[in-house]
């Protein structure tokens, strides 16, 4: 399962967030409330990775685990989390969500600009800050041409983003396994894009899993280029599953490196739980938060 498979359900209004009785039982087994965290890392979780829970149940779960943010929600989902006092740490637009059709192709600019011009004021009005975007796949477009296309299109929405205090964040994906042909698949490419756009309201969503797969050198990359990174995602390598000792990344050291940069934004868990038992899936999120709470 990956995020692309969840996009269609989001557009249909379900977001894939249905709750089975077994999931409910597992959810109710968690008795801890307001687990004290150290406060050096602001934690979040990507909604699509816990899609066996209803969104309001996921809100209650994250509060029981001691944090108060959820990633990757569209405007129609915000009222649900607002009722629970939960923050949307990374927003979608209300329109078409495509990881493969993005800013690197001028033929997409008209609908993208329309969607983002509508979404930016909504994000600001809701009290949120981050709005995700995607480069799109190459589809034969040269990387340099694609970058210039991104610059041309994104600059048309930057004044509005700056006016509203919204940060547009392009996600870095690996093209080796999960997102073949995706253009923004190297941190160097994304960093150069940030430099060309030249606004504090455009940054990169540095996905630790994706960049470990595509290029490695995670801690050094963060230390050297943290000013271009506005958000972080986690998952284990290989497999995109739990971030425990079954995979190769040592997340406590990565989190310490992030905290040492002075970063005050969110780190969102985006691993796909490998266990089929819902109680174990919830336990995995609890464990991941503890691992990252340095």
Language-model regions, residue ranges each:
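Catalytic domains of carbohydrate-active enzymes, especially glycoside hydrolases
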Residues: 58-77
